[in-house]
Curated annotation (Swiss-Prot):
TM helices/strands, residue ranges: none
Start and end residues of each stretch annotated as Disordered: 88-135, 219-263
Protein name, entry field: Dorsal root ganglia homeobox protein
Organism per entry: Rattus norvegicus
Cited InterPro entries: HD, Homeobox_CS, Homeodomain-like_sf, OAR_dom, Paired_Homeobox_TFs
Sequence similarity: Belongs to the paired homeobox family.
Keyword Ion transport annotated: no
Expression (tissue specificity): Expressed in most sensory neurons but not in autonomic neurons. Also expressed in the dorsal horn of the spinal cord.
Length: 263
């Protein structure tokens, strides 16, 4: 079994090659060197800004001349111009993003309308408008040469009050004259349709019929009371009716009556 071991170092020789420890220390310090933030004076900033206003990318000769003038190194001046260009690009980008919003006028914010407590909700209003529009369209389709057709007294389940009133006003405008709120002439003669409403007209007709019946009954009673008085008054002589037995026997002739006398 073999063992490998390092031979003893000779005195006066450098370990691990010909490099000295001083070389490693200088390289380590060079890598670990930290940058210090430069604090510019007011006069230095004014001179740098004046050159930046003329050109954003000064050449090396301009940077060296400026560095000698403000007592800085050319490297510091170059770094300042790099940072200043980055700041300028950021400012321009932010200004371009805000330009569309600045050009467009802000829309006026209008408060929502105050809804009355007793008014129907918006959903019911929209539904009522839709039903009114459908009713008007159906009425427009049923208009013929004889005039607008509208079923007499539509049931209340089909249209609500607002829709029914709008439909009636539309029919009145098409006809060109006033129209009853519940009874519309039916030119198609659809009398078999069930009638709804018209309570006032129906009540009036029933009352008129009852009054006519009462007048007729009174006239009949008056005529019945007048019959006995008219029968007692003198009149033409009534014709005598022969008895029942004489109707079967023929009347005797003249010769037969003379023969009976001679006998």
């Amino acid at each position: 079994m073999f063992y490998f071991h390092c031979p003893p170092q000779l005195e006066g020789t450098a370990p691990f090659g010909n490099h000295s420890t001083g070389d490693f220390d200088d390289g380590f310090l060079r890598r670990k060197q930290r940058r210090n933030r430069t604090t510019f004076a007011l006069q230095q900033l004014e001179a740098l800004e004046a050159v930046f206003a003329q050109t954003h990318y000064p050449d090396v000769f301009t940077r060296e001349e400026l560095a000698m003038k403000i007592n800085l190194t050319e490297a510091r001046v170059q770094v300042w111009f790099q940072n200043r260009r980055a700041k300028w690009r950021k400012t321009e980008r932010g200004a371009s993003d805000q330009e569309p919003g600045a050009k467009e006028p802000m829309a006026e914010v209008t408060p929502p309308p105050v809804r009355n407590i007793n008014s129907p909700p918006p959903g019911d209003q929209a539904r009522g408008k839709k039903e009114a529009l459908e009713a008007q369209q159906s009425l427009g389709r049923t208009v013929g040469p004889a005039g607008p057709f509208f079923p007499s007294c539509l049931p209340g389940t089909l249209l609500n009050t607002a829709t029914y009133a709008q439909a009636l006003s539309h029919v009145a405008s098409l006809k060109g004259g006033p129209l009853c709120s519940c009874c519309v002439p039916d030119p198609m003669g659809l009398s078999f349709l069930p009638t709804y409403g018209c309570q006032s007209n129906r009540t009036a007709s029933v009352a008129a019929l009852r009054m006519k019946a009462r007048e007729h009954s009174e006239a009949v009673l008056q005529s019945a009371n007048l019959l006995p008085s008219t029968s007692s008054s003198p009149g033409p002589a009534s014709k005598q009716v022969p008895p029942e037995g004489s109707q079967d026997k023929p009347s005797p002739t003249k010769e037969q009556s003379e023969g009976e006398k001679s006998v």
